Amino acid sequence: MALWMQCLPLVLVLFFSTPNTEALVNQHLCGSHLVEALYLVCGDRGFFYYPKVKRDMEQALVSGPQDNELDGMQLQPQEYQKMKRGIVEQCCHSTCSLFQLESYCN
């Protein structure tokens, strides 16, 4: 009986220190919920919404091509697929985990 009483605090610590299963479940996160989740996961590191390739391409398209800038930016099929996987597509249109959210941290 004494051994049980000595092990009880350890069992309680292990029980309460295991991650909540709800936090590990993939979730749909859209709008302000997505931004709040990113702030929570990334903290002071900050975050971005799109992969760097897409941001570079959007900037070139907004400013317009100069001296054939877009010639060097032709996308391969793999790169095009990466562009389609922004955080909204990954976490709002589909579901994402905390680990996937963390991939958008700076």
Curated annotation (Swiss-Prot):
The keyword Signal applies. Residues 1-23 form the signal peptide. The keyword Transmembrane does not apply. One of its GO terms (biological process) is glucose metabolic process. One of its GO terms (cellular component) is extracellular space. Disulfide bonds join C30-C92, C42-C105, C91-C96. It comes from the Eukaryota. Residues 56-83 form a propeptide. Keywords: Carbohydrate metabolism, Cleavage on pair of basic residues, Disulfide bond, Glucose metabolism, Hormone, Secreted, Signal. It is found in: Secreted. InterPro entries: Insulin, Insulin-like, Insulin-like_sf, Insulin_CS, Insulin_family. One of its GO terms (molecular function) is hormone activity. Belongs to the insulin family. Heterodimer of a B chain and an A chain linked by two disulfide bonds. Insulin decreases blood glucose concentration. It increases cell permeability to monosaccharides, amino acids and fatty acids. It accelerates glycolysis, the pentose phosphate cycle, and glycogen synthesis in liver. This is Insulin-1. It comes from Xenopus laevis. The gene is ins-a.
